[in-house]
């Protein structure tokens, strides 16, 4: 499989239009049109000879720049196809050089040396975001446990109340002791006088 880079595209160009333009040269496996930023695309030809024919015939047509994009390391995946641009060296594509690797034929967002296509980075950021949401319930759970930790103080509040009851119960026995030995009111007065 051979990947072809197409630059200087009109932002309104669709994948179907590109496929119709290049279909006559051979079997196209996939077509990818950039949207952010627009203006370029990649086509995967099943046969590298078909890709070379397409580059020869279409390069310069409609103002397009058509170059071959080589996979680094001998064809390791779709993301790698966007990383190369060896064919662009001979064409002087200095205005389309990648800021990451210095090669022409692709942008920094599509450079393999940067860690793959931009889509992969977005997927990583999405994968990182769910753990943040997963952590929040744990914090919420800890907060929910804190009221349970505060629940023991109510028994402590109950403990003073029996003491208060003891104090309320204790005075009647003292009064009973004073009143029991002396049935008459005079006896109580005599005791108080004798104590005085």
Swiss-Prot record:
Zn finger limits (CCHC-type): 96-113
A single GO cellular-component term from the record reads: nucleolus
Annotated signal sequence is none
Enumerate the residue ranges of region (Disordered): 58-196
- Where are stretches of biased composition, namely Low complexity? 139-149
Task: Write out the biased-composition intervals (Gly residues).
Answer: 72-87
Establish whether keyword NAD is in the entry.
no
Q: Which residues form the RRM domain?
A: 2-71
Q: Which Pfam families match?
A: RRM_1, zf-CCHC
Summarize the PTM comment. Answer: Extensively phosphorylated on serine residues in the RS domain.
**Compositional bias ranges of the Basic residues kind:** 119-135
Q: Which GO terms describe its biological process?
A: mRNA processing; RNA splicing
Q: According to its UniProt record, where is this protein located?
A: Nucleus
Q: Which residues carry this modification: Phosphoserine?
A: 48, 136, 144, 146, 151, 159, 170, 196
Q: Tell me one GO molecular function of this protein.
A: mRNA binding
**Domain of life the protein comes from:** Eukaryota
Q: How does it assemble?
A: Component of the spliceosome.
| Function of the molecule | Probably involved in intron recognition and spliceosome assembly.
Q: What is the designated name of this protein?
A: Serine/arginine-rich splicing factor RSZ22A
Q: Which organism is it from?
A: Arabidopsis thaliana
Write the lineage as a comma-separated list.
Eukaryota, Viridiplantae, Streptophyta, Embryophyta, Tracheophyta
This chain is encoded by the gene named: RSZ22A
């Amino acid at each position: 499989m051979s990947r072809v880079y197409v630059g200087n595209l009109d932002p309104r160009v669709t994948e179907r239009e590109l496929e119709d333009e290049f279909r006559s040269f051979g079997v196209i496996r996939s077509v990818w049109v950039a949207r952010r930023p627009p203006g370029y695309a990649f086509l995967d030809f099943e046969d590298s000879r078909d890709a070379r024919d397409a580059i020869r015939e279409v390069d310069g047509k409609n103002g397009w720049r058509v170059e071959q994009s080589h996979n680094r390391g001998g064809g390791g995946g779709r993301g790698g196809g966007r990383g190369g641009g060896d064919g662009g060296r001979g064409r002087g594509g200095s205005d389309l050089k990648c800021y990451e690797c210095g090669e022409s034929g692709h942008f920094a967002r599509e450079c393999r040396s940067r860690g793959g296509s931009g889509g992969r980075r977005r997927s990583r950021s999405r994968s990182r975001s769910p753990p943040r949401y997963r952590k929040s319930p744990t914090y919420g759970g800890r907060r929910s446990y804190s009221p349970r930790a505060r629940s023991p103080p109510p028994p402590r509040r109950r403990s003073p109340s029996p003491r208060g009851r003891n104090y309320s119960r204790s005075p009647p026995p003292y009064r009973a002791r004073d009143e029991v030995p002396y049935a008459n009111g005079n006896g109580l007065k005599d005791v108080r006088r004798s104590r005085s």
